[in-house]
Amino acid sequence: MNTDRITAFIKNGISARMPFYDTLPDMDLVFGKNHLPSLEYGANYFLQLSKINDINRLSTEMLSLYTHDLNKESDISKLFEPYNIKTIKSYGRSIQADAVVVDLRPSNSLYKNEHPYYKSNNYLKENNLYICDYTMITFEIYRPIFELSTEKTCIIKVPTLFGKTIVNAVRVYCSLFRYVKLYKLSADSWLKDSAIIVCQQPHAANINKFITYIRKVTKSQTWLDSNNVNFILIHDSVERVFIEKFLSFSYKIYESLYYVHSLLYSSMTSDLQSLDNEYQKKLIKLLRG
């Protein structure tokens, strides 16, 4: 494991400009379902899962103790100056601003529910962490499109890069906007696989086509909060070159997270049974600088 490379990723952040596609992929919207992870969309899921299960098994009280002050996220605002954004809005089509900014993180916490230490993975019923959970991507990821009025920039903080659904969602955005760039900034939490999508230069015809299709399927002219659920929009695989471009970005993040999570787990299970151990010191140095 190249720790110097990982340290550089965390200290400097990572970004990737995504390709523009003039044509939207074939769409067939189904609510209440989602894609299961597949090797085609990245083997990192299966590698990461072992480490996530290890951390899931430890008590949430201990997790909070060992990650105190290491999970801060202050990344979104860092992009305002580079993109000349002075005013923002989230939801409200009648409001005008420089950008639509939507934060889809479910929580600032690392975990969903408190639980004690589990002796075995047999006790794990689900991923209790807000990390590497592909079910966190809901149809709300497309809501910013319905909030655009005069804005030319859209910024979306997504909670995970895991799975087929997020890859497909970014692919759709790459036809709705001519400029799409992915970021994992140093100011983000490097305990999580969250990231930011920045979109500019709207493609009006494709946006109108997309909105018309969604309104037809949902039988509503306005956004319905009841649609903020798991979904499948694209059933076929998107372009292989696009998948590889996305994975070249996300792999660097998961490589870094694997190292971070390894340090965290080693610290939490250290024989010293104290925060004052070599793994925790490395973790603090890496994440706090």
Curated annotation (Swiss-Prot):
Kindly list the organism's lineage: Viruses, Varidnaviria, Bamfordvirae, Nucleocytoviricota, Pokkesviricetes
> In its UniProt entry, what is this protein called?
mRNA-capping enzyme small subunit
InterPro entries registered for this protein in UniProt: Poxvirus_mRNA-cap_ssu (IPR005009), Poxvirus_mRNA-cap_ssu_sf (IPR043096)
Q: How does it assemble?
A: Heterodimer of a large and a small subunit.
Reactions listed under catalytic activity: a 5'-end (5'-triphosphoguanosine)-ribonucleoside in mRNA + S-adenosyl-L-methionine = a 5'-end (N(7)-methyl 5'-triphosphoguanosine)-ribonucleoside in mRNA + S-adenosyl-L-homocysteine
Sum up the protein's function in the record's words: Catalyzes the last reaction in the mRNA cap formation pathway.
Out of the domains of life, which is the source? Viruses
Q: Which GO terms describe its molecular function?
A: mRNA 5'-cap (guanine-N7-)-methyltransferase activity
Compartment(s):
Virion
Where's it mainly located? virion
What are the protein's UniProt keywords?
A: Methyltransferase, mRNA capping, mRNA processing, S-adenosyl-L-methionine, Transferase, Virion
GO CC field: virion component
What Enzyme Commission number(s) apply to this enzyme? Answer: 2.1.1.56
Any single Pfam family the record assigns to this protein: Pox_mRNA-cap
